[in-house]
């Protein structure tokens, strides 16, 4: 068979959809299964899986350590994933892609600004109506004696409104600025290394998938990757 190369993102190992597709719950178990498949594919078929170093490698190792994965699993990462730094000074990309990326980021920044403005208007409006409602219910005869309680109530309402608004703002802002685009250096390194090696990209990230398509790179969804390796092994190598 033709030699296959894959360039993997952190999500190729850690994504929850990978665990679901494998039918396991724990990250340690799913990581071991994935790395064993990668090892079998490399030994029997010469399939190589590359990981950008140090950016994506450090990200993956840090995640596995935080999840208390055993040392044996982390050793498998060093053994079976080929660590390589993309040659950022030699890889050539069309200028049109840079233009598209800048335009995309500018549109997202403007959208984020509008979301921020709407959040401020919303919090001010809801807070005003809430305080106005409290004032209308206040008994004029006991206004002076309950002034402290009223101020405390106003503060509670304001804090509640701001808390809900900030939470909503964060979710909308994150979606507007980060979903479907490259939002980190490791994401870019995955694409650059795949371009350099003519490798397929393996990830569970909308931004990486979108820009892999624009670069003309092969893309494999993380949840499908273990079954692709199994199919290769079943067809060309040892049966699993």
Curated annotation (Swiss-Prot):
Keyword Nucleotide-binding: no
Disulfide bonds: none
Keywords (A to Z) from UniProt: Endonuclease, Hydrolase, Nuclease, tRNA processing
EC code(s) of this entry: 3.1.26.5
InterPro entries: RNA_free_RNase_P
Job description of the protein: RNA-free RNase P that catalyzes the removal of the 5'-leader sequence from pre-tRNA to produce the mature 5'-terminus.
Protein name in UniProt: RNA-free ribonuclease P
Taxonomic lineage from the root: Archaea, Methanobacteriati, Methanobacteriota, Methanomada group, Methanococci
